[in-house]
């Protein structure tokens, strides 16, 4: 039987390669930081989600090691059997405090949080109204649910209102959006979304994966930026980006929603609890962020410095209030060649092109970190200018 399937898989893989869409994994030979080792060469990393520079922070490493010594390596159980330690509840409380919500539930990843939120809450009597550029985990979570589906154009409030009007016959309606859209770096207009939700009696859910720790005056996310605390019903997010970059996800929001997810969310019920070492480091993250805004302030300074100088050099940069800077090249082949040339210059960035982004919207996505020094930013900018001139992107 596998002979036939092997032929089919081989053809499919060949088609992926021929289309230029085959994903190669480049091996990193060091810890994750602003500077990393790739193929025996030191390069500056500008494509990690390590927004606050905490992935290799000594304080997190110490807290993780200490917790593992005290509480063991793994839980070997799901939460509702014997996989809940007091530290799990402490982390859930810390996340609730950070987002100003009533309760929190932990998952192995935000993919699980988004995959496990809709089906327990909604039925075929209800409606999910989702932004067209939402993350794949939201899309997959919606597919697992029987609710009627609507999709509105990215951050388009007129189109969202159209969907809300069409969904008025449904029992419950929920608007779902990323806080920051990962390919463009644009921020959802959450205040306007909440206005429409209140007008048409809908719930609001925001995925804060790329915005928590980054967006807002102190980095507390899109609700802080837009003044919408208390108006959002559900937040999902990850511990794998700004909050240390390891693993773990969460859903935080209204108490009754979280209570029901504990009873019926399948990724929560049937996945092992987060390991104590992850919990220990994550508790340290929220302690650090409660104590000081220093890392967020440094990130904002770095983002503004990079954007201003790249735009002054003549690059087309998408507007953003996040740490994601999309350097627009528009041509798929050019984006691949540009990224390869940047690595030759000692800068690790990635080119994105169709189908990850729309046709003729190819770009280099640059992700800035609080860990980047001014010297490293200058080196990255200089490399962009050099390669840009060599490839006739800049005159």
Residue ranges and their predicted role:
Residues 58, 62-66, 70, 93, ...:
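PLP-dependent enzyme catalytic core of the Aspartate aminotransferase-like
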Residues 150, 154-206:
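Active-site phosphate-binding strand-loop segment of PLP-dependent enzymes
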Residues 218, 224-260:
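Active-site PLP attachment segment
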Residues 297-306, 311-346, 356, 360-361, ...:
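Conserved PLP-binding catalytic core of the aspartate aminotransferase-like
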């Amino acid at each position: 039987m596998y002979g036939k399937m092997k032929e089919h898989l081989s053809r499919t893989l060949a088609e992926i390669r021929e289309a230029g869409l085959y994903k190669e994994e480049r091996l990193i030979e060091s810890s994750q930081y602003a500077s990393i080792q790739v193929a025996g060469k030191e390069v500056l990393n500008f494509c990690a989600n390590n927004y606050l520079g905490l992935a290799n922070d000594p304080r997190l490493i110490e807290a993780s090691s200490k917790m593992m010594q005290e509480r063991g390596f793994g839980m070997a159980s799901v939460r509702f059997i014997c996989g809940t330690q007091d530290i799990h509840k402490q982390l859930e409380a810390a996340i609730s405090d950070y987002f100003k919500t009533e309760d929190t539930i932990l998952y192995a990843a935000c993919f699980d949080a988004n995959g496990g939120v809709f089906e327990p809450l909604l039925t075929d009597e209800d409606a999910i109204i989702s932004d067209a550029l939402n993350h794949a985990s939201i899309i997959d979570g919606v597919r697992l649910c029987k609710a009627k589906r609507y999709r509105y154009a990215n951050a388009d409030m007129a189109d969202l209102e159209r969907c809300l009007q069409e969904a008025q016959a449904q029992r419950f309606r929920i608007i779902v959006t990323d806080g920051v859209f990962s390919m463009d770096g644009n921020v959802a207009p959450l205040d306007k979304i909440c206005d429409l939700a209140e007008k048409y009696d809908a719930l609001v859910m925001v995925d804060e994966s790329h915005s928590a720790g980054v967006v807002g005056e102190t980095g507390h996310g899109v609700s802080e930026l837009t003044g919408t605390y208390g108006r959002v019903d559900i937040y999902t997010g990850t511990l794998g980006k700004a909050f240390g970059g390891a693993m773990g996800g969460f859903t935080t929001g209204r108490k009754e929603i979280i209570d029901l997810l504990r009873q019926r969310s399948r990724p929560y019920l049937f996945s092992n609890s987060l390991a104590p070492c992850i919990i220990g480091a994550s508790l340290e993250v929220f302690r650090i962020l409660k104590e000081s805004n220093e890392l967020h302030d440094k990130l904002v300074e770095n983002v503004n410095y990079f954007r201003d100088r790249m735009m002054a050099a003549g690059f087309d940069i998408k507007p953003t209030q996040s740490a994601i800077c999309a350097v627009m090249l528009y041509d798929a082949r050019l984006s691949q060649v540009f990224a390869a040339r940047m690595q030759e210059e000692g800068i690790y960035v990635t080119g994105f092109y169709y189908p990850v982004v729309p046709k003729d919207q190819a770009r280099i996505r640059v992700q800035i970190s609080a860990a980047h020094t001014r010297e490293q930013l200058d080196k990255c900018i200089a490399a962009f200018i050099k390669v840009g001139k060599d490839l006739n992107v800049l005159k």
